[in-house]
């Protein structure tokens, strides 16, 4: 495979690609290249995928935990086929359940800062999923969901919309790791408004710095 990562030309044989291979989904294959991960779209993709214009816009935005495109990837003919992102070593995401809940809340605050940065650049986060969460003692969102640039909306409204999406993600995905029953989920819904300030509401309920995420959620669903 012959590709350009930004201005750098790579001629990768099958053996090298096998060595670099990390994972794949319905729309793309992921390879590790140095400190970066290369997301290369499959030829036939039936899902919506990030277009070149949006990827280029995102590559100019600086975030801490939401991993955005760095360089555009093209084939020999100059066609857009993907992009590079920072590579993150990860542990199983369920490990977050064993950490002190205040650590999770601190991580959420950092992600909220990234959401503010994206919102200030008119970037709307359309979807978040647990498969996009990377955990290595810190929480990262690896290429989360889909993005839309909505310059016709005010950045404040985009921020509120993005935080609502983030709040739903915390409820439906992070808490899902505990395999909560339907009744327990209803209890959580009564306790929290999963809108734009989920982290602050959760922080008010923390008993001490040593309480783990698992203990906290179980306590809140009694």
Task: For every predicted segment, state its role.
Residues 3, 9-11, 17-20, 24-28, ...:
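Catalytic phosphate/metal-binding cores of nucleic-acid and nucleotide-processing enzymes, i.e., regions
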Residues 64-108:
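Conserved structural core of kinase catalytic domains
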Residues 1-12, 45-51, 205-222:
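Regulatory N- and C-terminal appendages and interdomain linkers associated
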């Amino acid at each position: 495979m012959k590709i350009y990562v930004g201005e750098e030309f790579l001629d990768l044989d099958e053996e090298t690609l096998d060595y670099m291979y990390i994972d794949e989904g319905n729309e793309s294959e992921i390879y590790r290249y140095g400190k970066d991960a290369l997301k290369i779209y499959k030829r036939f993709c039936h899902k919506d995928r990030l277009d070149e214009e949006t990827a280029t816009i995102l590559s100019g935005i600086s975030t801490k935990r939401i991993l955005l495109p760095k360089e555009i990837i093209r084939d020999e003919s100059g066609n857009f086929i993907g992009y590079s992102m920072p590579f993150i070593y990860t542990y199983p995401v369920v490990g977050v359940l064993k950490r002190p809940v205040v650590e999770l809340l601190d991580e959420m605050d950092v992600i909220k800062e990234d959401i503010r940065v994206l919102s200030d650049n008119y970037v709307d986060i359309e979807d978040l999923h647990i498969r996009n969460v990377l955990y290595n003692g810190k929480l990262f969102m690896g290429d989360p969901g889909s993005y839309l640039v909505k310059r016709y909306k005010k950045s404040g409204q985009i921020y509120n919309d993005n935080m609502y999406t983030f709040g739903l993600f915390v409820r439906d995905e992070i808490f899902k790791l505990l395999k909560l029953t339907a009744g327990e989920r209803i209890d959580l819904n009564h306790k929290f408004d999963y809108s734009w300030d989920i982290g602050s509401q959760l922080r008010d309920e923390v008993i001490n710095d040593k309480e783990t995420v698992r203990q906290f959620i179980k306590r809140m669903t009694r």
